[in-house]
Amino acid sequence: MALRLGAVAGLTTVLTGLPIADAAAATSSSFGTGGDGQVIHLLARLTSRTDLDLGAPGFDQGDEEVFTDDLFRGSVKVGYDGGVCTVLIVEPDGSSESQCTATFSLPGGQIAAQGLIRLPATGQAEFDIAITGGTGKYRKARGHISGTFLNATDSQIAIHVTH
């Protein structure tokens, strides 16, 4: 899931130390809906982004980012996502908080999610947002999506789905 608004206040230089190929390959479930829940581990790679400077000039409240990512399990593309984030707060130290909504298109259906994402001025940025619904295999989906921004284009995500 993208969230890089204006290079995200230095996130482009932050790496987890985990090789991207290893992060994407760390999967533990299929795309089926067996049992009461599953975790889908993916690598989200940015494919397009538009930053909209809607407030005062510069990075501030009201600015938006519209994005799409390709979703990978290992080296195989398994879907895509798209969404928009609106900046709510920019602190004097450069940290910020945005309201984000995104839809993940996967084999068998879509998963919708939203939540607040806090980006520190420096250091690792992580997020945890609510699954708000779905279609197809995911029509009764609930749960959350957690993730870590690895660099300016890649995020490691885990979709925790309950039915």
Model features per residue range: what roles?
Residues A24-H163:
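Beta-strand-enriched cores of mature, soluble protein domains
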